[in-house]
């Protein structure tokens, strides 16, 4: 998960064309990537460029967690310019798909735990079962 997130953000910070793909992404994402998406939309609404500096500045005004800014700062220092544009786009799409799959698997684990708890307490778990089936179907589409 971390390696996919890291590579995704490294590419984002070095390639402006990938922002559009991320902002249009409809799959599952991690909480950190979700914050980046929300903040990037704020930046764009102010007619600013999506740069590491603007991203970190906007995050610091909306999120008190310095860990996210530190993470972005570290990734912004990495040089991936040696990768060809096509290769970067392919890796970016692969990272999005991997993050999507990981998030679905994490949700599946959570639903299974909820079902087990309800089963052990003698409660109905039909809603969890439906959610589980939906997630399994989504995972199978991958």
Residue ranges of predicted features:
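Bacterial replisome coupling helices
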Residues: 45-142
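Non-catalytic protein-protein interaction segments used by genome-maintenance enzymes to assemble
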Residues: 1-49, 72, 105-108
């Amino acid at each position: 998960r971390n390696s996919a997130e890291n590579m995704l953000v490294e590419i984002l910070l070095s390639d402006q064309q990938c922002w559009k793909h991320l902002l249009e992404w409809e799959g599952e994402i991690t909480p950190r990537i979700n914050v980046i998406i929300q903040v990037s939309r704020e930046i764009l609404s102010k007619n600013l460029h999506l740069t590491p500096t603007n991203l970190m500045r906007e995050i610091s005004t909306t999120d008190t967690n310095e860990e996210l800014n530190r993470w972005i700062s570290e990734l912004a220092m990495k040089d991936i310019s040696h990768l060809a544009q096509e290769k970067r786009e392919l890796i970016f799409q692969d990272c999005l798909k991997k993050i999507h799959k990981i998030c679905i698997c994490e949700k599946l684990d959570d639903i299974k735990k909820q079902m087990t708890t309800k089963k052990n307490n003698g409660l109905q778990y039909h809603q969890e079962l439906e959610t589980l089936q939906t997630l399994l179907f989504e995972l199978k589409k991958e």
